[in-house]
Amino acid sequence: MTVPSALVPILLLGTAAVMVQCLPLSFQRNDTVERRWETLFSRSMGEKKDTSRDSDYLLGIKRQRRLYCNVGIGFHIQVLPDGRINGMHSENRYSLLELSPVEVGVVSLYGVKSGMFVAMNAKGKLYGSRYFNEECKFKETLLPNNYNAYESRKYPGMYIALGKNGRTKKGNRVSPTMTLTHFLPRI
C-alpha cells in the first residue's frame, strides 16, 4: 500500500465518527429512558437504585398515607379485615393505606393491616377485595383546595365518599364538588 492509499481508510473512519456525533437526538441513545427501565427492573428484582425524587412517583413508588375527609367531625377512611370500608375519627391501624400508581393519574388503595384493596362495584358501593382487579383502580384528581378526589376508573362519575356519620356513600350519588368526596392524604 502506498501512503495516500493508507490515508483513505483513516479519513473514512474520521468522517464516520463526526457523522455519528452530529446525528439528531432521536437516533442517539436516551440515557434517561434506559436509566428508568434499569430502575424498574432492579425494583422487580428486589434491589433499590438511587433515583431523583421527582421521578420516583412516576416509577411506581408506593406511598403510605391516611386519607382524611373533613366532613362531620372529620374521618380517616379505613379498610377492615372483613371487607367493610368506613370512616373513623381517630387514626388506627386499619386506616393506613398504601397508594400505588397503576397508570398515569390512576392509583390503587390497599389497606396495609387488613390486606385488602379498596374497590367499587357497579352500584357505587365500596368494598374490600383480597385480589386486585379493575374495580380497584381510582383516578386521583388534585382539587383547587389541595384535597384529592378518587373517581372509579371502571365506572366514571362514581367517587369515593364518606358521609357525616363516617359511613360510605354510594359513588353514583355524589359529585366531586361535594366536600364528602374530598380527601387529604396524611402521613
UniProtKB/Swiss-Prot annotation:
Origin species: Xenopus laevis (African clawed frog)
Domain of life per record: Eukaryota
Keyword Signal: yes
Signal sequence bounds: 1-22
Family from the record: Belongs to the heparin-binding growth factors family.
GO molecular function, one term: growth factor activity
Keyword Signal annotated: yes
PANTHER family: FIBROBLAST GROWTH FACTOR (PTHR11486)
PROSITE patterns given in the database record: HBGF_FGF (PS00247)
Induction: By derriere.
Keyword set, alphabetical order: Developmental protein, Differentiation, Growth factor, Mitogen, Secreted, Signal
GO cellular component terms, A-Z: cytoplasm; extracellular space
Cysteine pairs bridged by disulfides in the record: none
Protein name per Swiss-Prot or TrEMBL: Fibroblast growth factor 4A
Gene Ontology BP terms: fibroblast growth factor receptor signaling pathway; neurogenesis; positive regulation of cell division; positive regulation of cell population proliferation; positive regulation of MAPK cascade; regulation of cell migration; zygote elongation
Location in the cell: Secreted
Function according to Swiss-Prot or TrEMBL: Plays an important role in the regulation of embryonic development, cell proliferation, and cell differentiation. Good candidate for an inducing factor with possible roles both in mesoderm induction at the blastula stage and in the formation of the anteroposterior axis at the gastrula stage.
